[in-house]
Amino acid sequence: MNIYDQLQAVEDRYEELGELLSDPDVVSDTKRFMELSKEEASNRDTVIAYREYKQVLQNIVDAEEMIKESGGDADLEEMAKQELKDAKAEKEEYEEKLKILLLPKDPNDDKNIILEIRGAAGGDEAALFAGDLLTMYQKYAEAQGWRFEVMEASMNGVGGFKEVVAMVSGQSVYSKLKYESGAHRVQRVPVTESQGRVHTSTATVLVMPEVEEVEXDIDPKDLRVDIYHASGAGGQNVNKVATAVRIVHLPTNIKVEMQEERTQQKNREKAMKIIRARVADHFAQIAQDEQDAERKSTIGTGDRSERIRTYNFPQNRVTDHRIGLTLQKLDTILSGKLDEVVDALVLYDQTQKLEELNK
């Protein structure tokens, strides 16, 4: 099937979906209505671009006709030639855009995410930088109109985070933040440094798509659930009723503890969200590691310990090592304005996938 047949098939399906979504039987079936609505939304940009492309093709035909029928009118012929030139340039732009829109979509792109940030090498300074990254993602999420909820946090004594887990919900969250997984390195003078020396520290970020209960086939027998009393500062028990929950996935030994909420039920629900995401991510990583190197993730190696980005404070510089992008905008980026970085990563990924398809 060539690209035009593919595009026509997408448009035909889009029109069919429009009819189905106005069918009373479909509207009354909430689950089916949501599935079809999601499918329609995922095809919308492609259909709009394809319809605009067909109009550009018609503009080329019209301009060629005008040149033929100009009857020696130099001004009319010149105008038609300019219109033809513009339309042909537009045609090339649309063809590239449509190739990208037809690329196989990551099935997780529309999902919410579980975001984990940990202070790694560098002690207190690494934990403080983990807090800076948390703020950066919070502000970026706010600008995107997403919901950002801190689910669990383990702080150190200086206001940094040894570990923090957050849920980010909204439209196409995973598609934009999936490239953030990896080691983020910071170079700056710590507050505690009296000699003014630049120190290097690292925080790690892990982005996992949310896994709905219906998607995850976790056998309850594979889970050990412990209930205990939530503890506050200094280790004292803060609840008379045991509300804290620890869930261990026995086959992988993945463990989640949750005590942020006041009820055992809510802590259990949150812990299960994280455990489903971590277990799915664990097996996804095994599957990816077994793939041929050529078929691995097109950005980086997929290695969680891979250094993906450096934040250099003295030079106000951010460098993404995977795509060779350097921006002298560290302050802007840490304030949540991540669009330039995200857009560059998305474009690079799409370009790599196009090259693979053309091999």
Swiss-Prot record:
GO molecular-function term, one example from the UniProt record: translation release factor activity, codon specific
Keyword Zinc-finger carried by entry: no
Source species of the chain: Streptococcus pneumoniae serotype 19F (strain G54)
This protein's record includes keyword Protein biosynthesis: yes
InterPro entries: PCRF, Pep_chain_release_fac_I, Pep_chain_release_fac_I_sf, Prokaryotic/Mito_RF, RF-1
Pfam families with a match to the protein in the record: PCRF, RF-1
Gene that specifies this protein: prfA
Function summary: Peptide chain release factor 1 directs the termination of translation in response to the peptide chain termination codons UAG and UAA.
Post-translational modification: Methylated by PrmC. Methylation increases the termination efficiency of RF1.
Cellular component GO terms held in the UniProt record: cytoplasm
Keywords: Cytoplasm, Methylation, Protein biosynthesis
The protein's name: Peptide chain release factor 1
Domain of life assignment: Bacteria
Main location: cytoplasm
